[in-house]
Design a protein with these regions (language model features):
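Bacterial signal peptide processing site
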Residues: 22-25
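C-terminal motif of bacterial Sec signal peptides marking the signal peptidase cleavage site
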Residues: 16-20
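Positively charged n-region of N-terminal signal peptides that target proteins for export
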Residues: 1-10
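Calycin-type beta-barrel ligand-binding domains and close structural analogs
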Residues: 32, 105-238
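Low-complexity, Pro/Thr/Ser/Glu-rich flexible segments characteristic
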Residues: 27-34
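Processing junctions and N-termini across compartments
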Residues: 12-15, 45
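N-terminal helix-cap/turn-to-beta initiation motif at the start of protein domains
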Residues: 34-52
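Short, solvent-exposed loop/hinge segments that bridge or flank secondary-structure elements
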Residues: 35-36, 52-129, 172-180
Length: 238
């Protein structure tokens, strides 16, 4: 089963291809989807746990050698450092929404994704059908119970809606069908309006796709997620 980082794969070819973004832009109109064969009818109940932002963990200096080992066989030792920086940078951009859409329309070569948590959330706690967001001090930002929606979309995401009124930015969640067991990370988006979650490239949350990893991840998980992120996506871009 191919286990790709969905948002990253949309723009990697743009920066690695010698042909430039002119051709790659066409590819982004039909973004790759994750294999859903192992996903249950109620995905949210399969990912219980506490999650932190993925890319600040991936970019820690103690994991640099894992990156180099993963990228060297594909791009060569002389390019491994630069490629690692590129891979991380592709998902650690600050702008999103209309600001990002305007920026990347005028400068396609700078295209990247914001994969951080928004709305003042430092950690997400998934517990059955309840999603809770905690800030950096451990205080609750929100906590709601969610129901599964029957919502089809081109990205293959699984949609949930809060059962509480006035849920604001956390009214809707859209999850890529990743789990810690299959892809060693999660990808998801959230918004007040469902329409903002239908496209990676339009709306108030364009070029944003939160990426998370279990707070209690171990060394083996970090090795696996880096190998997945580096090896499969670089191979796909060749």
């Amino acid at each position: 089963m191919k286990k790709k980082f969905a948002a990253f794969a949309l723009c990697l070819i743009c920066l690695l291809s010698a042909a430039g973004c002119g051709q790659a832009k066409t590819d982004t109109q039909t973004p790759p989807t994750t294999d859903q064969s192992a996903v249950t009818d109620d995905y949210l109940t399969t990912i219980s746990g506490t999650y932190v932002e993925l890319f600040p963990e991936l970019s820690k200096s103690e994991y640099r050698s894992i990156w180099i080992d993963a990228t060297t066989p594909i791009v060569g030792a002389e390019n491994a450092e630069a490629t690692t920086d590129l891979l991380l940078g592709m998902c650690m951009a600050e702008p999103y929404g209309p600001v990002a859409a305007e920026k990347y329309a005028s400068d396609p070569n700078s295209m990247a994704f914001n994969c951080y948590f928004l709305g003042g959330v430092d950690k997400f706690v998934m517990d059955g059908h309840t999603i809770t967001g905690l800030d950096a001090q451990g205080q609750e930002v929100f906590s709601h119970t969610y129901k599964l929606l029957d919502e089809e979309n081109e990205n293959g995401f699984i949609f949930y809606q809060s059962e509480d009124k006035g849920s604001g930015q956390f009214t809707y969640f859209a999850f890529s069908p990743d789990t810690m067991e299959t892809t060693y990370h999660l990808e998801f988006r959230y918004a007040e309006d469902l329409s903002d979650l239908q496209s990676w490239f339009e709306g108030n949350y364009a070029y944003w796709n939160a990426a998370a990893i279990a707070e209690n991840y171990d060394q083996a998980t970090m090795e696996n997620v880096i190998e997945l992120f580096g090896t499969e996506n670089l191979s796909n871009a060749e």
